[in-house]
Amino acid sequence: MGRQNIVVVVALVFMAIIGLAAAASSPSPSASPSKAPAASKTDHVEAPVTDDQIGTTDDDAAPTPGDGDVAVAGPLGSDSSYDNAPTGSADSAKSGAAALGVSAVVVGVTSIAGSFLLL
């Protein structure tokens, strides 16, 4: 009889984990390049270029053949590469914690209810 209780509790915990995985927020779809905001153009003074520098020396992306209206990211680590990054909403970090808290409560309640049902 005790072994059946363990099986039921494990099954309930497994279902709660599946519920948590299903309720977790999916990653937001990335914005298409044609809808990405254009990087702001600001004038600033750059350090002199040395012979050891590789790649572009400014924040502009390399020219590409094709649509000139499409915004593309600049070199890695440049200021313009961060301008096109998607921003999360203010409560997106809290939503995962709330789902985890609700899931923990559901697991606790279902395991206690399951143990009382099979006693």
Swiss-Prot record:
Tissue expression per record: Expressed in mature pollen grains, developing microspores and tapetal cells.
Compartments, as annotated in UniProt: Membrane
Domain of life: Eukaryota
Cellular component GO terms, alphabetical: membrane
UniProt KW Signal keyword: yes
Known function: Major pollen protein required for pollen fertility and development. Active in both diploid tapetum and haploid microspores.
Protein name per Swiss-Prot or TrEMBL: Anther-specific protein BCP1
Species: Arabidopsis thaliana (Mouse-ear cress)
